[in-house]
């Protein structure tokens, strides 16, 4: 593990695998350092998009506890600090045209992308959603702690763009 809690009872863990009070105490400095390492990227994304940085940080804390690795079970796959799903990818591609117009030509032919996400066939939409969700997957079997942080800035910017897309969709529905 990342934290050495061998001098704690049961190595710092309860029977269910959760940290015991001693394990929590040992982990606190590492946890604080881990979650605060993303502050500059969050601030940069906030400045670029006008999405409040505190909102993003609180959502990251709730959704992923600042762990950008994949969370997968039989029903759903979530990636990145914001836990992007295929439905979340669909939302940002459909409701944030500025983001779509930058991302789509990285995956599909520019001529295929020119009319917008809703005009793509189902196969091309699925390819874009898959490429987008996997682009924020930080899992790496050969990296320290199993996480590759080299793409974290894109993951954070994408999350801000996804929040903008959700606002756009909500505004459409309310009006």
Mark where each language-model region is.
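Cell-wall glycan-active module
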Residues: 1-175
